[in-house]
Amino acid sequence: MDIVGGQNLRQMWDDLAGVYGDKTALIFESCEGIVRQFSYASINEEINRTANLFYSLGIRKGDRVALHLDNCPEFIFCWFGLAKIGAIMVPINARLLGEESAWILQNSQVSLLVTSAQFYPMYREIRQDNSTPLNHICLIGEQLPADDGVSHFSQLQARQSATLCYTPALSTDDTAEILFTSGTTSRPKGVVITHYNLRFAGYYSAWQIALRDDDVYMTVMPAFHIDCQCTAAMPAFSAGSTFVLLEKYSARAFWDQVRKYQATVTECIPMMIRTLMVQPAAPTDRQHHLREVMFYLNLSAQEKDAFTERFGVRLLTSYGMTETIVGIIGDRPGDKRRWPSIGRVGFSYEAEIRDDQNRPLPAGEIGEICIKGIPGKTIFKEYYMQPEATARALEPEGWLHTGDSGYQDEDGYFYFVDRRCNMIKRGGENVSCVELENIISAHPKIQDIVVVGIKDAIRDEAIKAFIVLNEGETLSEAEFFSFCENNMAKFKVPSFMEIRTDLPRNCSGKIIKKNLK
């Protein structure tokens, strides 16, 4: 079943502008509380002007342009402006430093960058090193340095027509984006995403949360991340909903923003759930319009129940990764939810559990979660310029090896166990980091927890726990180890513990374990 019907992103926006016109498409709120709002018709004009801006700078179909931006409307304009002329967006994680950013520029052969003033000093150094093909920077902001090869985004865009001046032939198979994975354990890989991928993501995720044109979808997820793009922005726009994009996450402001914009759907990661729960309880906690909170791994049953009870809104679990584009396994609209299951496989996909010899496993047995989709349509097309890595992850028949461990029950519900690289081998036993983290997080004094494996001459690996305590709490080693011994098998009890003020995280809130070993 082809639900995209050959429609590329240029056609999508022209159609949306015609159908929804003056209806609000995008609301953006900055950290300072400044609000900018765009209708479907006006945002399409902004996108067209931005497309013409890129054309005026020499960008043509197939060229790659990098974006290094925090959340802002200009990210949306650039994303779809590039797509309208067949060019390719290369979003860069806004937290990356110079060497990491330069590596992405070099490996994607980017000559033009759009960024903001706060990141400009880093890129000025990169250009001076001559280590990348970068030769022009388009800056967003009020200040414009008097440097060669630098232009001002707002000034250039304001000069452009709202009618496209360059309309090359487009296909849904054309690449729209190269999104580099977070690379917490090695160099990031460029995930190639097509026009079809993004259109499909919009329809699929809108189905998953039963999104309608009277919904308001609010997100704080970074726009350079797959979650914001394919489980928030694309479904919101595809359904004709209103998309609310916040510049940054604030636990203190979050519920006020939900109420202010009358959001009906939002998305959260575990870090957000936990920080929202430590805010002082208020009589207004349940006074909102949210009907769904899209949720991504991992959370203990105690944390899930406490959140649902306090705020009166359920979590809709969705499992996926950059390569799957969307949450290919998850809760379904109107279907039973079986916590801690991650749900059932969505339409257009197949899923099964396989052993180390790549053979399907029966219900109840733990193995690798494998997903079948159509490359370039329902799953990513390939890793950019890395055919060997593509071949390792993606079988010719469309089966994707996720690298995650899980199992399936007799009713077709899937259960996530751990990232396969997140298993600790201890004295012949496989220990799931997630299992231990869920158990330990139930301790009333602990706010955040991560466990890692460290080398052990006798038992392969020993287990070390890094802990962040709730404000004002103290925790002795004796108290910690006693709690563990009472709540888990002896071979799972950590050998070491370390208390920290915070844990290192990447842009999507995932803990960077390599920084803890």
Swiss-Prot record:
Coiled coil: none annotated. CDD domains: FACL_DitJ_like. It comes from the Bacteria. Its EC number is 6.2.1.48. Keywords: Ligase. Gene3D superfamilies: 3.30.300.30, N-terminal domain of ligase-like. The keyword Cytoplasm does not apply. One of its GO terms (biological process) is carnitine metabolic process. Pathway: Amine and polyamine metabolism; carnitine metabolism. InterPro entries: AMP-bd_C, AMP-bd_C_sf, AMP-binding_CS, AMP-dep_synth/lig_dom, ANL_N_sf, CaiC. GO terms for molecular function: carnitine-CoA ligase activity; crotonobetaine-CoA ligase activity; medium-chain fatty acid-CoA ligase activity. It catalyses: 4-(trimethylamino)butanoate + ATP + CoA = 4-(trimethylamino)butanoyl-CoA + AMP + diphosphate; crotonobetaine + ATP + CoA = crotonobetainyl-CoA + AMP + diphosphate; (R)-carnitine + ATP + CoA = (R)-carnitinyl-CoA + AMP + diphosphate. PROSITE patterns: AMP_BINDING. It is an enzyme of class 6 (ligase). It holds the Pfam family AMP-binding. The keyword Ligase applies. HAMAP family: CaiC. Belongs to the ATP-dependent AMP-binding enzyme family. Catalyzes the transfer of CoA to carnitine, generating the initial carnitinyl-CoA needed for the CaiB reaction cycle. Also has activity toward crotonobetaine and gamma-butyrobetaine. This is Crotonobetaine/carnitine--CoA ligase.
